[in-house]
A protein has these predicted regions:
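Residues lining hydrophobic/aromatic ligand-binding pockets adjacent to catalytic sites
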Residues: 1-169
Length: 169
């Protein structure tokens, strides 16, 4: 009886300060919507932050409305920070494999007042302590603009970053 009551008693722990919680990133390239959702649930994500300039996809389940609906069904919030997305000329450079041009274009874009305002909003959201994941198409975070967003966030916070990689099966 004594052991049972001890098992029911939960130890009180202090909540982690907001900036010590990881900021997650995830790309959906090659993955099915269910695999992305499973990975978000596994990481206990509370809000998915869509960082695509255009929240549309030829891949079923990844356009804004479909994605937001499936996230809502799973109890995960959705926010679209469009101005943190890669501008059209950057997406063209990425498709052609010119990563240096992509970075030049994106680094210039992230300095615009509109992008800075959304970056400020993202930093404020991080400071709430919610478990967030940044979403874009690219599977590899090193070749995605998410890495540039993260670099900007890390200059302003002490947040750690973890990249989620959804299963391909």
């Amino acid at each position: 009886m004594k052991a049972r009551s001890k098992a029911k008693t939960k130890a009180k722990t202090k909540a982690k300060p907001a900036e010590t919680r990881p900021l997650y990133t995830i790309g959906y390239q090659l993955a099915k919507p269910a695999a992305v959702l499973d990975e978000l649930k596994r990481a206990k994500i509370e809000i998915l932050v869509d960082t695509r300039a255009v929240a549309a996809s030829r891949r079923p389940g990844f356009s804004k409305r479909q994605l937001a609906a499936s996230l809502d069904d799973a109890g995960i919030g959705y926010i679209h920070l469009q101005k943190l997305g890669t501008p059209a000329e950057g997406r063209t450079a990425a498709r052609s494999g010119d990563i240096d041009a992509l970075w030049r274009i994106y680094d210039k874009h992230i300095k615009t007042p509109e992008a800075r305002a959304e970056l400020d909003g993202l930093v404020d959201l991080i400071k709430t302590g919610k478990r967030l994941a940044l979403l874009c198409y690219c599977r590899d975070p090193k070749t995605c603009h998410r890495s540039r967003i993260v670099a900007n966030v890390k200059r302003r916070t002490s947040v750690k970053v973890e990249d989620l990689i959804p299963s391909l099966f």
